[in-house]
């Protein structure tokens, strides 16, 4: 989400909005939004309805979370681009900015490799133990 914070003004300048969706409770989502200084809202899907309907529900993590994903939806509610990612491969926000600014072929958007930090590994191990 921090990547989208860094490109937020470019995304808005291209005429788009940014919204994050989380399965966390509203207070936890708001704390994260404040901690990361996100200029966009985090919508809460505590019953996992939206993430299930959009095919991004990951039941194997923390009792069920959303997979990292990006959707570009036009004003007519048509999904123009969708990427369901993994922890280690994500579409950079700069690629979405390019897509929006140039009306580029959506197939040209590339994912980048994310190298997990040590703290990410610790979190993943805790998730496995909590199962």
Give the ranges of each region predicted by the language model:
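Chalcogenol-based redox active-site neighborhoods
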Residues: 1-131
């Amino acid at each position: 989400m921090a990547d989208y914070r860094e490109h937020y003004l470019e995304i808005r300048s291209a005429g788009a909005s940014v919204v994050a969706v989380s399965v966390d409770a509203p207070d936890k989502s708001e704390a994260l939004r404040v901690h990361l200084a996100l200029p966009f809202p985090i919508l809460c899907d505590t019953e996992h309805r939206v993430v299930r309907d959009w095919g991004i529900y990951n039941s194997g993590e923390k009792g069920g979370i959303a997979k990292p994903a990006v959707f570009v939806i036009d004003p007519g509610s048509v999904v123009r681009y969708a990427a369901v990612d993994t922890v280690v491969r994500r579409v950079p926000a700069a690629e979405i900015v390019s897509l929006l600014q140039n009306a580029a072929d959506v197939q040209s958007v590339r994912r980048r490799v994310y190298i997990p930090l040590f703290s990410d590994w610790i979190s993943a191990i805790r998730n496995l133990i909590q199962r």
